[in-house]
Amino acid sequence: MEPCEDKCKRGLSLNFFEEDGPSLRLNSDSLDFLARDFKVEGMSQDNFDQKTKLYITEESLQKEVNIFLTKIYIRESEREPPQSHNSVFQLLSKIRNSVPNVSAFRNNLSILSKELSFFSFARHIHNRRLCWAEFIYCIRRGIKAIFKTTVQFLPTRLAKIFEKKASEVLKDNLLQTCNSKREGEVCDVKEPAVASSESSDCFNDMQELNNIVDLRDYSNSRFQQNRLLDRNLKGWIQGESEKALKGRRTTKRNDKENYNYPDFSNDNELLFSLATLIVENNPKKENIIPKYYLRYLQRLSRTEINKEIIEIEKLELEVVQFQMSIANLINTQVEVTNTIEELGLRCRPLPNENE
């Protein structure tokens, strides 16, 4: 049996230094221990699948989510982002087949769909780094939520083993990724990860990785300054805002060379949406946006603001429709004849390889 750590260390790799934007690769093998280390005693694998398998196919689930992501991202992008989100549902498939409990999986899927809706405002933002950082954040939240809810359905002894393994994988494998400012290379973990990984080169970069991923932590001024707005965009916003305070119109693009900002399709749309993203996801709303930024936004015409509100309402409707599609998918395709409690079966972990 191949040790879990040999696969886990290849689980997640991030690179924020590629020319065409950050990349994410999530390998479902990193959680293969879920399907391998637990089994149902007294029942063959075939019967196990027939009796307790959740009939939500990867294809049907991916179809719904791909439609959602297409509406949010791809329709306004010049180039399609890498289809990394497919790996999320390979991951869900592993968890689905390993924990034979209908309620747990239904709850987990609902949680994941809510997490996906968090980055809906990224539709307006053509900053690829920000979009993909939000996407990674949602994946992390979804994985943590899945682990948290499935543990409570396991017997006490198994729950402790499961929780320990999940914690090790999350902390020391999935999140153990280099954010090296020297070359932007992903760490090559040579040995199986352990809880005390201070000696690892990756360990010192984990906090920086968390700052990149956790977009809701706007109280971190260093993150806000260095990650939320890149230097060019921040300089352009400040310059445009100062002009607005002097009574100059801000819709012209005659200062592009001076500020060297990215070529967005609609500057006002970007600014309004970026402000919305910040305000909606930060409890300290009165302190997060500089006064000159707010004054600039106030100078937008009522027509422009109304257009933005309409777009956001359409987007919220798409999120609701997506969540309803997932709910319908669960109701129509989850066919479980009996739960593990009704079958009266006992779970136990597989013996270790050395035993």
Swiss-Prot record:
GO biological process: actin cytoskeleton organization; lipid droplet localization to prospore membrane leading edge; meiotic cell cycle
Free-text function comment from the UniProt entry: Has a role in meiosis.
Keyword Coiled coil annotated: yes
Coiled coil: 298-338
UniProt superkingdom: Eukaryota
Keyword Zinc-finger (UniProt): no
Cystine pairings recorded for this chain: none
Taxonomic path: Eukaryota, Fungi, Dikarya, Ascomycota, Taphrinomycotina
Record keywords: Coiled coil, Cytoplasm, Meiosis
One Gene Ontology cellular component annotation held by this UniProt entry: cytoplasm
Protein name: Meiotic coiled-coil protein 4
Localization terms from the record: Cytoplasm
Primary gene name: mcp4
